[in-house]
């Protein structure tokens, strides 16, 4: 969770039309291959419209610790899905559409911020650099340019957003990041 008192920033980060990258790990029912993920890479049709192409891949048990701390059990598969929309339950619905319902889901990256150093039940203030990244619209994930079959990407870090007549950023960093599992 990301707590902020800046309503414009919140709107810019959360609205599906802003295309902020979100990275999820999912443990799904059934055996899933990279080839099975192709409909998600092309953009899959859900009941509320066509999704933008996702960046996705099957991940191994070592990478999937957030969703499978005791390892990936037989009959399940761990996947990483990177989306730019953020519709309600989008990742769960996308994976269900290809007949692999989600057993466990974890968002591990939001707009370039990672949760790896935030313990469950704790929080920390964002650094000034992280606040700048968020105000610039986040940054694309590292995997976007290096993975075969990746969805087209845009450089969201180069986009500037204007937040009305708000003056300079507050002197005290009021943004919070909190992970609750």
Task: Indicate residue ranges for each PLM-predicted region.
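RNA pseudouridine synthases
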Residues: 1-143, 147, 179-181
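Intrinsically disordered, Lys/Arg-rich low-complexity segments
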Residues: 143-181
């Amino acid at each position: 969770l990301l707590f902020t008192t800046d309503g414009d920033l919140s709107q810019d980060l959360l609205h599906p039309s802003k295309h902020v990258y979100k990275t999820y790990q999912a443990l799904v029912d059934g055996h899933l291959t990279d080839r099975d993920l192709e409909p998600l890479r092309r953009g899959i049709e859900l009941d509320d419209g066509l999704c933008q192409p996702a960046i996705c891949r099957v991940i191994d048990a070592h990478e999937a610790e957030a969703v499978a701390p005791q390892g990936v059990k037989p009959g399940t598969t761990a996947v990483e899905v990177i989306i730019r929309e953020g519709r309600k339950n989008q990742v769960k619905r996308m994976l269900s559409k290809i007949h692999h319902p989600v057993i466990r889901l974890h968002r591990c990256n939001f707009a370039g911020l990672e949760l790896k150093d935030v313990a469950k039940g704790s929080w920390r203030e964002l650094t000034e650099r992280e606040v700048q990244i968020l105000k610039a619209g986040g940054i694309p994930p590292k995997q976007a340019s290096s993975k075969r079959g990746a969805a087209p990407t845009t450089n969201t870090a180069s986009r500037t957003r204007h937040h009305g007549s708000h003056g300079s950023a507050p002197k005290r960093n009021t943004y919070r990041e909190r992970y609750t599992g």
